[in-house]
Amino acid sequence: MEDKNITVDKIVEICEGRLLSRGTVSTINAFCVDTRKINAKDMFVSLKSEKGEEIQHIKEALQKGAIGCITEKDVPEEIINKYKDRNIIKVKDIICSIQKLAIYKRKMYDIPVVAITGSVGKTSTKDIIANVLKQKFNVAKTEGNYNNHIGVPITILNWKENINAAVVEMGMNHLGEISVLTNIAKPTIAVITNIGTAHIGLLGSRENILKAKLEILEGLSKGGKIIINNDNDMLQNCDTKEYEKITYGIKNKSNYMAYDIERKDNCSEYKIKMDDKEEKIVVPQTGEHFIYNSLCAIAVGKTTGIKTNKIIEGIKTFKITEKRNETKEVNDLKIINDYYNASYDSMKAALEVLKNMKGNRKIAVLGDMLELGDYSENLHKKVGEEVAKNKIDILCTIGDLSKNIAKEAIKLGTKEVYQFKTNEECINKLKEVIKKKDCILLKASNRMNFGEISNYLQGENLWEEQN
């Protein structure tokens, strides 16, 4: 097997860096940007710190056994002398350096690379596609939220020698960002899940969001395929240049279409024609958006030559990433943890999942949606419409922006609505109102810290604390 690890000398060459100290280990097989997660023998990538703590982070990484660090900072002599057995490399631009290294690493692999973007559903689509690909390939996939100008290069730099397929998630909130990522990852298959309203305040319009997402084509390999959601109004007739377009959907005629859909308490089932034969698909999550995600995975599976029975198995057994539409049954409650991010489209999808759950009352705890700019008030009101439409029994909102969700829901007939400024206030109200067998949705942007509410609901003494 060809050695795909990067040497210290190659890092210095590619990054046009300066070797301040040469360590005893000259080959790097893992890169890390977080001192809390660093392992012995990792190369620490020292990113700029808002608090100016780069040197402290370098010391911490080296203390934990990192084989070296790459940094823009002047490293004090005392650190260099103390860690003479480590590789310390100084570069002019840390972001540019890791991106150049990732481009170099990517060229070592002649494998299927699936790049995924879209306004919502990127992570769950990534998870289900990766699980389908695992039925045939040894797969690397984006972990956590490593989907930006730092995360994508680090993801590629950490590809193991033995992988033969990869799934790379690409996020953005400005024009030009996907262009950079796709030219690093050089996908063979591009996926666009949908064009919604996430980051519309920064991009100005859905047309600009579409333009930003279509940048994914700029790095797509010659002969590559683009897979799109044909039920999305913005994607239906989009220009995919010279690339073959493969479509999936439920409503509009597509290459891969779901029909005879059945929604159950803990899964969805549907039928689909593959290779002129009718097949039954079981998706281990509820909600229409998961049906779309699975259709996308089928398209990827077929494009990469995976057998039908293996595709079906990959969909049936996939697991969702924590905090993203993660359903837990605990303390005689059903809790949907979906508080990594929030947009109108993802709120709408989550409320649909809540509506279809079997249980006692349906309780939605919703927080502010961010980065919506001038569209914020209207889109929060539209979420309020969805609350009323889905007949949610109890609505709790937290934050100034989400007051518009509450107002619209009340206006349209939702009877029990509470508005709060803090998570603590909300928890105190939940102590009063929740009952056994209730279904509770927690949905907000990550910075709203809804993990506090989730932890309370999952606490060992929950019912003893009830007022």
State what each model feature region is.
Residues I111-V114, V191-T197, N229, S294, ...:
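Short beta-strands and strand-loop turn motifs
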Residues M1-S97, M257-Y259, T286, M357, ...:
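N-terminal leader/targeting and accessory segments in enzymes
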Residues C69-K73, K92, E242-D265, V282-E288, ...:
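Beta-strand->loop->alpha-helix junctions that form or flank phosphate-binding loops
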Residues E72-D74, N194, N230, G399, ...:
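Short secondary-structure boundary segments
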Residues T125-I129, E262-E278, R324-T327:
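Acidic-glycine-rich active-site phosphate/pyrophosphate-binding loop
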Residues D9-E13, C96-K225, N230, M234-Y243, ...:
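Phosphate-binding loop of NTP-binding sites
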Residues M1-G17, A40-M43, E53, T188, ...:
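ATP-dependent carboxylate-amine ligase
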Residues C32-V33, D265-S268, Q285-C296, E322-N325, ...:
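Short glycine/threonine-rich catalytic loop with a Thr-x-Gly-x-Asp
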